Amino acid sequence: MALSIGAACGSNDAAPAAAASPAAPVTTSEVTGTVPRNAIVTLMPAEPVPMPAGPAVMDQYSKTFVPNVLYVRVGQPVEFRNSEDMPHNVTVIRRGSGTEVFNVSTEPQQKYVHTFDRVSQFDVTCDIHPGMQATLIAVQSPLATVAGDDGRFTLSNVKVGSYKLSLTFEGRTVEQPLEVSQARTEVRVSP
């Protein structure tokens, strides 16, 4: 499987200006592409990105996980709260492998803290209330998303610069350098 990376400029349908003025330098880009479906797409900046100051939070409220999709950094504590007056539990299973990471009871107004140690997607459920479901995605960088079922993804407002592009899918990770220097950078994975 190979990565194909190209730069594309956005279209400009406006009429040309009477006098040409210097173009403003590109400072941010949109990184788009087609990769394996449901792959975790991560851009790692050349400079380290500080870990968020506090834990990420997934709450149990009104028989719902809030938020129902949560991105966290690998190594960042995640606080699973129960803000209700009824007991719940939190079961976390690694998507793809079916490996149970943990299954803990969360009593009313209590919390459980866990730190994820690898890039992966996780299914979060409550065994007591089967309708409660969420997704947790652990990533190395705040510049991350999950490709859709069609393999398409978009990362907006990416600063121009050097990155390591990381794709995690089907239990493996593929990495390659990526230079973001255009208004739009296109990424494709070809077999």
Which residues are covered by each model-predicted region?
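Bacterial N-terminal signal peptides
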Residues: M1-G6
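Extracytoplasmic copper-binding redox domains, predominantly the cupredoxin/blue-copper superfamily
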Residues: C9-P191
